Amino acid sequence: EGGGLSADSGEVIIDAEGLFLLPGAIDPQVHFREPGQPEKEDIGSGSRAAAAGGVTSFLDMPNNVPAATTLKAMQSKIDSATRNAVTHHGFFIGATPNNVSDLQDAVGTPDNPSPTDGICGIKVFMGSSTGDLLVHQQKHLENIFANTGGIIATHAEDEDRLNERWPEFKHRTDIAAHAEWRDETCALMATQRASALAKDHDHRLHVLHLTSGIEADW
């Protein structure tokens, strides 16, 4: 005989005999371009596409137009998801060199972590990427790691190395140039730096899109 599962009154029963039951996947880094660029994608269309592919939860990034760096901006995204998303969802607030008080409003402090419903953590771009969010100076990173609660998720690339190597690559237009410019050493340097900050300040850390074996081995 099978297990002891039984339906409660009013619950829908799906006959799945002979089928596979698979867990929904979680995508911890999506870039639904809402607000600012809905012609590319918005929360509704992105979540429907996710669900069609078996992704039942997503965490969205803050490098929108404009960037989501305040609680007010975050609440607008959360409200849109409440109306339009068809999956579970969460949102990262973007860090800047001078918005620690906004981050605290969203996720609290080390002594009093108080994440706002719908906000899953702080996104720190240690290297420049799409959008205008960039925090790479040590004093600003220290301030964020020392004075905020919750989880910090990093785009871990070393900005100084990117700038040093840019003259070598700025005339390249081939697809390989991107990976060669943003090389393994660039990623490792930032991952090591973020890890040291997290350890020094006892802060939870998630390194997004870790891309190299040397980072994993380190």
In which residue ranges do the predicted regions lie?
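Active-site mouth loops of central-metabolism enzymes
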Residues: 28-41, 64, 87-100, 178-184
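Short, surface-exposed connector motifs at secondary-structure boundaries
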Residues: 55-59, 84-89, 197-205
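Histidine-rich, glycine-flanked metal-binding segment
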Residues: 1-23
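Structured loop/turn residues at beta-strand edges in well-structured enzyme cores
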Residues: 8, 53, 87, 117
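Metal-associated gating/positioning segment near the N- to mid-region
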Residues: 16-84
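Hydrophobic faces of well-ordered beta-strands that scaffold small-molecule active sites
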Residues: 24-30, 58-60, 89-93, 120-124, ...
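Histidine/acidic residue-rich metal-binding segments in metalloenzymes
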Residues: 101-218
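Short beta->alpha linker loops
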Residues: 69, 95-97, 210-214
